[in-house]
């Protein structure tokens, strides 16, 4: 029995136009005629396929078994990494032989993927679509960005994937900056409080030194003039009597009957000589330089104060405290003003002054002298 393959006859018939027909006959007599056109390769036969990174990523996302860690989004034009930890520890070693999630994101950035949602790991590319695997060949690896304005505008509302790693670092730096600013403000407040305390302490020290100097000058003046202390005590007693008289007349009611005051002035004298002791005339004629408050008090009470009780000027009344004490202004005026004829009438030996200065040396701000 003959082999059927040997019965095939190939005939070529030439035509004037240079074309030809190829006829192939089989045992059943059928013939196949093909145009005499040179064969061409299939479209895309020699084109390079999509990069392995894209194909592996597509397979990983399209796999229904990995939906717990990564899956397509609801719009099917992006994919979401739901569990970055499981994605890095389980899926990346299986598909890419490493477990570095940051490296995977950087690879996505080089192929033009963008982070869609800043609050989750959702990535998108216009040619990375669900059910359209053939579009992966259109995704090309990007060249290094030239940082031009056109590239920045092309990003649109998306966020660059490569910047994801800096977000946490930026947040941490912002928190550190806020803490440092709060610490700086606190230190500045403490510095201001310290300066205020130092200023108050300096003022107190200066006041103490000034009082010590005034005390030394006062004691030196007493040593020069022994009568000065007696005169000062007598003036102090006169002031106290004057204050007592004024305070009692202020407390006395106008409709109260006449009484004898502390300075010995009787109401009977006022009744016998009303013209002589008229309050207004007595103040104008007998008293010169009386403070207005003492003058009003005497007139309101309807009584009369002897002129010798008012032998104190307004400035001295202001220097007397509420309890009859003398303030700093009194001491300054007392030490600055001179007593006429005191130094000539009561000379003091210079040696006594030196002894006093040595004994009172401990009052100075520098501490006690070496002689003590």
Curated annotation (Swiss-Prot):
<dbReference type="InterPro" id="IPR000232">
    <property type="entry name" value="HSF_DNA-bd"/>
</dbReference>
<dbReference type="GO" id="GO:0006357">
    <property type="term" value="P:regulation of transcription by RNA polymerase II"/>
</dbReference>
<feature type="short sequence motif" description="Bipartite nuclear localization signal">
    <location>
        <begin position="238"/>
        <end position="253"/>
    </location>
</feature>
<keyword id="KW-0963">Cytoplasm</keyword>
<feature type="region of interest" description="Disordered">
    <location>
        <begin position="247"/>
        <end position="274"/>
    </location>
</feature>
<dbReference type="InterPro" id="IPR036390">
    <property type="entry name" value="WH_DNA-bd_sf"/>
</dbReference>
<keyword id="KW-0804">Transcription</keyword>
<dbReference type="GO" id="GO:0043565">
    <property type="term" value="F:sequence-specific DNA binding"/>
</dbReference>
<keyword id="KW-0597">Phosphoprotein</keyword>
<keyword id="KW-0539">Nucleus</keyword>
<dbReference type="Pfam" id="PF00447">
    <property type="entry name" value="HSF_DNA-bind"/>
</dbReference>
<comment type="similarity">
    <text>Belongs to the HSF family. Class A subfamily.</text>
</comment>
<dbReference type="GO" id="GO:0003700">
    <property type="term" value="F:DNA-binding transcription factor activity"/>
</dbReference>
<comment type="function">
    <text>Transcriptional regulator that specifically binds DNA of heat shock promoter elements (HSE).</text>
</comment>
<keyword id="KW-0238">DNA-binding</keyword>
<dbReference type="GO" id="GO:0005634">
    <property type="term" value="C:nucleus"/>
</dbReference>
<dbReference type="GO" id="GO:0034605">
    <property type="term" value="P:cellular response to heat"/>
</dbReference>
<comment type="subunit">
    <text>Homotrimer.</text>
</comment>
<keyword id="KW-0175">Coiled coil</keyword>
<protein>
    <recommendedName>
        <fullName>Heat stress transcription factor A-2b</fullName>
    </recommendedName>
</protein>
<dbReference type="InterPro" id="IPR036388">
    <property type="entry name" value="WH-like_DNA-bd_sf"/>
</dbReference>
<keyword id="KW-0346">Stress response</keyword>
<feature type="short sequence motif" description="Nuclear export signal">
    <location>
        <begin position="356"/>
        <end position="363"/>
    </location>
</feature>
<feature type="coiled-coil region">
    <location>
        <begin position="165"/>
        <end position="252"/>
    </location>
</feature>
<feature type="region of interest" description="Hydrophobic repeat HR-A/B">
    <location>
        <begin position="173"/>
        <end position="223"/>
    </location>
</feature>
<feature type="short sequence motif" description="AHA">
    <location>
        <begin position="328"/>
        <end position="337"/>
    </location>
</feature>
<keyword id="KW-0805">Transcription regulation</keyword>
<dbReference type="GO" id="GO:0005737">
    <property type="term" value="C:cytoplasm"/>
</dbReference>
């Amino acid at each position: 029995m003959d082999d059927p393959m040997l019965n095939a006859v190939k005939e070529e018939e030439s035509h004037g136009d240079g074309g030809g027909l190829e006829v192939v006959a089989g045992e059943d007599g059928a013939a196949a005629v093909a145009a005499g056109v040179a064969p061409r390769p299939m479209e895309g036969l020699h084109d390079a396929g999509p990069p392995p990174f894209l194909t592996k990523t597509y397979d990983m996302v399209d796999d229904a078994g990995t939906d717990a860690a990564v899956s397509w989004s609801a719009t099917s034009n992006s994919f979401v990494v739901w569990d970055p930890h499981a994605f890095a520890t389980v899926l990346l070693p299986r598909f890419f032989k490493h477990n570095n999630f940051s490296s995977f994101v950087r690879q996505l950035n080089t192929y033009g993927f963008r982070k869609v949602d800043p609050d989750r790991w959702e990535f998108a590319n216009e040619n990375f679509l669900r059910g359209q695997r053939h579009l992966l060949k259109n995704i090309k690896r990007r060249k290094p960005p030239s940082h031009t304005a056109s590239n920045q505008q092309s990003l649109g509302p998306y966020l660059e994937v490569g910047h994801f790693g800096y977000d946490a670092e930026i947040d941490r730096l912002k928190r550190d900056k806020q803490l440092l600013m709060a610490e700086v403000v606190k230190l500045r407040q403490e510095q201001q409080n310290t300066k205020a305390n130092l200023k108050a302490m300096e003022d107190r020290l200066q006041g103490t030194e000034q009082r010590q100097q005034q005390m030394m000058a006062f004691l030196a003046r007493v040593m020069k003039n022994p009568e000065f202390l007696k005169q000062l005590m007598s003036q102090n007693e006169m002031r106290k009597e004057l204050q007592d008289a004024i305070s009692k007349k202020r407390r006395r009611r106008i409709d109260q009957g006449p009484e004898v005051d502390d300075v010995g002035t009787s109401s009977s004298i006022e009744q016998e000589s009303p013209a002589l002791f008229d309050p207004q005339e007595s103040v104008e004629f007998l008293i010169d330089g009386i403070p207005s408050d003492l003058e009003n008090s005497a007139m309101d009470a309807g009584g009369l104060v002897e002129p010798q009780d008012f032998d104190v000027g307004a400035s001295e009344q202001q220097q007397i405290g509420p309890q009859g004490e003398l303030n700093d202004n009194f001491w300054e005026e007392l030490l600055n003003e001179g007593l006429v004829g005191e130094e000539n009438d009561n000379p003091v030996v210079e040696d006594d002054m030196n002894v006093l200065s040595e004994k009172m040396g401990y009052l100075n701000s520098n501490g006690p002298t070496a002689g003590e």
